[in-house]
A protein has these predicted regions:
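Nucleotide-activated chemistry modules centered on ATP-dependent adenylation/adenylyltransferase
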Residues: 1-201
Length: 201
């Protein structure tokens, strides 16, 4: 893929560090696509985005921010709120984000799409690839790159870069439902939130 135009969907800086370094050092120069409407609250989203921007600058890599649409993401996750991590909600979340990445890749002439989600040991690699292949099947001219970014020493290098860069390293995946299974407490009463998927009268 060295001579192909690569779009790298990035979930956060800690997961991106070793992947960006590896790609650039091997002659590829990806464009980072930050599409993470799952992240809640908005301040958390911005914090993770700013860390990605900071790291991209160190490598001279372009980063593109997708529109933040948490209400749209909540509609995608509706009915799956109580699913465990690596459950059906995670699969639908990956599909939501990677479809947006695939659409951007198609519209902007990219050949290959891959994601930093595949670097996290907390995520199902099978789910990530299922979502990636599906997303690329919905567009034309974009190939899914099912790379296992946990192998070849990249997991160890990932942890080194987190320390070297002093990255903000989040305690939960991103959405308010994953807060329940992470170390962070939900920042507000989830039950009191209005349902964005219901028609308001």
């Amino acid at each position: 893929v060295k001579n192909q135009k690569i779009l790298l969907h990035a979930c956060c800086a800690p997961c991106s560090g070793a992947i960006v370094e590896y790609l650039v050092n091997n002659g590829a120069k990806p464009v980072i696509f930050y599409s993470n409407s799952n992240i809640y609250p908005r301040g958390e989203y911005d914090l993770r985005l700013n860390e990605c921007i900071r790291y991209a600058k160190t490598w001279g890599v372009e980063i593109v921010e997708d529109q933040y649409d948490h209400d749209g993401w909540l509609c995608c996750a509706q009915g799956l709120e109580t699913e465990p991590e690596r459950g059906l909600r995670c699969l639908e979340c990956f599909k939501f984000r990677l479809l947006r990445a695939a659409q951007y890749a198609q519209d902007n002439g990219f050949d290959v799409l891959t994601t930093t989600l595949a670097s996290s040991r907390w995520k199902s690699l099978d789910q990530v690839n299922q979502a990636g292949f599906w997303a690329c099947s919905q567009v034309s001219g974009v190939t899914w790159w099912p790379q296992n970014w946990r192998k070849g020493g990249l997991q160890e290098r990932r942890n080194q870069i987190i320390k070297e860069q002093n990255f903000y390293n989040q305690l939960y995946c991103g959405c308010e439902f994953s807060q329940r299974t992470g170390s962070a407490e939900p920042s507000e009463d989830l039950k009191s939130k209005a349902d964005p998927c219901q028609v308001q009268e």
